[in-house]
């Protein structure tokens, strides 16, 4: 076999691999964007529900009931379903940015940035507030429930609204990416 023939064979093999890889990637785009959008939607819905229903409802409670309820909900929310969507939203958006193709990529990148932003808000704001609320101890042993609530509620609500907006933005960007996939 000559050098030219070997080079032609290698070029042909690489071309076939590229076609196969491109075809496989094209088959993944739709389902991947769908999964990313569904998970982003679940996250946006979670934060939306907290912003529009849970926190306004809790706002009407006395300090003792508010602190106790939030402590219990902060325990309950740390479960496999929530954690998989919480971490899955930016991971799936990032995967979509890699595999969705050039027409959809800018929107998938924007979705990834927004989904990561949601995590940053959570890790820098909401989770430390949750931890501080838990560190205050059982409601029966907290001396100043009003102060504990005041240190938590207003900022947590604002941060959750920011998470709602960023995760809804990620969902919107993923929908736009899906509309541009070719």
Provide a role label for each language-model segment:
Residues 85-97, 164-171:
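Core segments of transmembrane alpha-helices
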Residues 112-133:
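Hydrophobic alpha-helical transmembrane segments of integral membrane proteins
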Residues 2-4, 8-24, 31, 42-87, ...:
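Interfacial loop at the N-terminal end of multi-pass membrane proteins
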Residues 34, 75, 109-112, 154-157, ...:
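Internal alpha-helical transmembrane segments of multi-pass membrane proteins, especially GPCRs
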Residues 48-51, 97-104, 123-130, 175-182:
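Transmembrane helix-loop junctions and nearby membrane-interface residues
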Residues 26-41, 95-119:
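Interfacial segments of alpha-helical transmembrane regions
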Residues 132-182:
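A generic hydrophobic-segment detector
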